[in-house]
């Protein structure tokens, strides 16, 4: 008989215990993962938006950015509850019967509430963290122009 998850916490583990990962594995996975899928909703309509992100481990925050205006920003202002799913595909597993074919994958789901960063220095720190994740060998002011006040005014972090 299927389980009833209606009253279960979203973080309640649902897989076999041998597939459970500890905090260190989860943190390392969030640091190396390239793309996350941000689940958000508005007026009962769910949306999933692929996004790059930075796991700010020191502050236990997931940092991402979007346009200053748009559907995602509007949705998040009305309903800040989100879920970020991050995954990577493993091996494809053939079988002798169709229903036994499978795929291995690793994933993490993070549940939380979006908070828009307001202070310019907070935004800069977050954006530079995001840039360091994807372009670790490039330095602001050397390989690219530092983030300007005008650019900060055009983005949401």
Where are these regions (language model features)?
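A generic structural micro-feature
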Residues: 45, 76, 102-106
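Short beta-strand segments
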Residues: 33-68, 84, 100
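A generic structural signal for nonpolar/aromatic side chains embedded in well-ordered alpha-helices
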Residues: 30, 75-76, 130
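Short, basic/aromatic recognition patches
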Residues: 8-37
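Glycine- and acidic-residue-rich phosphate-binding/metal-coordinating active-site segment common to enzymes
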Residues: 80-81, 85-88
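Charged, gly/pro-rich active-site loop segments
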Residues: 1-17, 91-157
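Solvent-exposed residues in well-ordered beta-strands and their adjoining turns
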Residues: 67, 87, 115-117
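Histidine-centered metal-chelating micro-motifs
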Residues: 69-74, 83, 92
């Amino acid at each position: 008989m299927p389980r009833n998850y209606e009253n279960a916490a979203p973080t309640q583990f649902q897989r076999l215990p041998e597939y459970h990962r500890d905090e260190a594995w989860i943190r390392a996975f969030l640091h190396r993962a390239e793309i996350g899928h941000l689940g958000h909703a508005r007026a009962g309509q769910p949306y999933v938006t692929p996004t790059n992100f930075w796991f700010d481990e020191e502050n236990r925050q997931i940092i991402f950015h979007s346009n200053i205006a748009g559907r995602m920003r509007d949705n998040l202002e009305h309903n800040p509850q989100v879920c970020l799913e991050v995954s990577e595909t493993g091996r494809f597993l053939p079988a002798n019967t169709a229903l036994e074919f499978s795929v291995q994958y690793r994933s993490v789901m993070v549940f939380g509430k979006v908070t828009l960063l307001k202070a310019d220095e907070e935004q800069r720190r977050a954006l530079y963290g995001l840039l360091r994740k994807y372009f670790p060998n490039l330095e602001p002011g050397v390989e690219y122009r530092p983030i300007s006040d005008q650019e900060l005014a055009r983005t949401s972090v």
